Swiss-Prot record:
Gene (name only): PSEN2
InterPro entries xref list: Pept_A22A_PS2, Peptidase_A22A, Preselin/SPP, Presenilin_C
Disulfide bonds: none
Modified positions (Phosphoserine) in chain numbering: 22, 25, 30, 52
Protein's name according to its UniProt entry: Presenilin-2
Short motif (PAL): ranges: 414-416
Record keyword Phosphoprotein present: yes
Species of provenance: Microcebus murinus (Gray mouse lemur)
One MF term in the entry's GO annotations: aspartic endopeptidase activity, intramembrane cleaving
Gene Ontology annotations of biological process type: amyloid-beta formation; calcium ion homeostasis; intracellular signal transduction; membrane protein ectodomain proteolysis; mitochondrion-endoplasmic reticulum membrane tethering; Notch signaling pathway; protein processing; regulation of calcium import into the mitochondrion
GO cellular component terms attached to this protein's record: endoplasmic reticulum membrane; gamma-secretase complex; Golgi membrane
Lineage, highest ranks first: Eukaryota, Metazoa, Chordata, Craniata, Vertebrata
């Protein structure tokens, strides 16, 4: 039973029978104030229903455009639009920061643009004069790289399906240790060499230790949300720099195209590994490990909060034009049907919405390959700023379109295909068409 505050400050108690009242057989309406009799209630109900029917006869489809027939496009649609824009900003800012860190490092630190080795996953070299042989080697490197990614993803899904959580945690902790300690040590050393900054080894070791220890605590246990997000962006940038340095040029572009296709298949196919991982997590009502996912809101993991399952409930109210006509909430705003959730114990009612907001989640692999594309554009070929900025804008446009599709389909979608496709198209078109045109134009001026 819900109580709505009318505009004339009269309180009416509406139950299920009164909310489903029809014009053909109006049910008597009970009112608790003012001594109003049943006859007055019937006449009031009939007047409201007739008025709504007359409005419906004028234009029966006037509210269909909002997506829900018979529902006015009011504040709820505006609220949805605001949250959509907020979610775009929540993901655009960290993606932008990650790409800025990578591009700034590529433009200033020569270590990450020097080719003095390759990954074990790309054994075929591209130092051949033959274009066909170079293309073949890049395709073979791509096949090996994608095969390794597929095998490791399936292995992770199998471990998660059989609840091997300790093994997964150990795997992720070892990866985080390598990124936060070893790769950070290498990165900091090269930055200090580039800018000719002297630092003794004890200070360097202490700095790396503090950085890595705090990162391990924030990522795998507890910590402020913004600090956790900053560490996830940092490890994504470090991993992207490793790929930029050790991936051959042609192999990098072919891998970017192939990984976007694989991401499409892995997420959208019924038996795709990433889709199975997401569906398994949803069935168990468990969050995916924070070390794999960037979240714009706090991700609750096992041990961070003890919630009472019996306290979580929802009440779905049916849509009733009569209630909507002069039903107002306690703040005087029009009240629309929605899902009311019981407050969790220990949280104030006014903070419930903020605490329950899950935010938007983006895989760290998407951060890495976005940054690889922009970093390769800045490091290889002409390396001019026009090409780099074109790839940067293309990735953000693709991310916005992906979020738009996410709002439409309301299910997990791959974040790489649109952004990587736009990035590759913008890179090759800018590098081969726009840049020569601008050089010629500047020469003749």
């Amino acid at each position: 039973m819900l109580t709505f505050m009318a505009s004339d400050s009269e309180e009416e108690v509406c139950d299920e029978r009164t909310s489903l009242m029809s014009a053909e057989s109006p049910s008597p309406r009970s009112c608790q104030e003012g001594g109003q009799g049943p006859e007055d209630g019937d006449s009031t109900a009939q007047w409201r229903i007739q008025d709504s029917e007359e409005d419906g006869e004028e234009d029966p489809d006037r509210y269909v455009s909002s997506g829900v027939p018979g529902r006015p496009p009011g504040p709820e649609e505006e609220l949805t639009l605001k949250y959509g824009a907020k979610h775009v900003i929540m993901l655009s800012v960290p993606v932008t920061l990650c790409m800025i860190v990578v591009v700034a490092t590529i433009k200033s630190v020569r270590f990450y643009t020097e080719k003095n080795g390759q990954l074990i996953y790309t054994p075929f070299t591209e130092d051949t004069p033959s274009v066909s042989q170079r293309l073949l080697n890049s395709v073979l490197n791509t096949l090996i790289m994608i095969s390794v990614i597929v095998v490791m993803t399936i292995f992770l899904v199998v471990l998660y399906k059989y609840r091997c959580y300790k093994f997964i945690h150990g795997w992720l902790i070892m990866s985080s240790l390598m990124l936060l300690f070893l790769f950070t040590y290498i990165y900091l050393g090269e930055v200090l060499k580039t800018y000719n900054v002297a630092m003794d080894y004890p200070t360097l070791v202490l700095t790396v230790w503090n950085f890595g220890a705090v990162g391990m605590v924030c990522i795998h246990w507890k910590g402020p949300l913004m600090l956790q997000q900053a560490y996830l962006i940092a490890i994504s940038a470090l991993m992207a720099l490793v790929f930029i340095k050790y991936l051959p040029e042609w192999s990098a572009w072919v891998i970017l195209g192939a990984i976007s296709v694989y991401d499409l298949v892995a997420v959208l196919c019924p038996k795709g590994p990433l889709r199975m991982l997401v569906e398994t997590a949803q069935e168990r009502n468990e969050p995916i490990f924070p070390a794999l996912i960037y979240s714009s809101a706090m991700v609750w993991t096992v041990g961070m909060a003890k919630l009472d399952p019996s306290s979580q409930g929802a009440l779905q109210l049916p849509y009733d034009p009569e209630m909507e006509e002069d039903s107002y909430d306690s703040l005087g705003e029009p009240s629309y049907p929605e899902v009311f959730e019981a407050p969790l114990p220990g949280y104030p009612g006014e903070e419930l919405e903020e605490e329950e907001e899950r935010g938007v989640k983006l895989g760290l692999g998407d951060f890495i390959f976005y940054s690889v594309l922009v970093g390769k554009a800045a490091a290889t070929g002409s390396g001019d700023w026009n090409t780099t900025l074109a790839c940067f804008v293309a990735i953000l446009i693709g991310l916005c379109l992906t979020l738009l599709l996410l709002a439409v389909f309301k299910k997990a979608l791959p974040a790489l295909p649109i952004s990587i496709t736009f990035g590759l198209v913008f890179y090759f078109s800018t590098d081969n068409l726009v840049r020569p045109f601008m050089d010629t134009l500047a020469y003749h001026q």
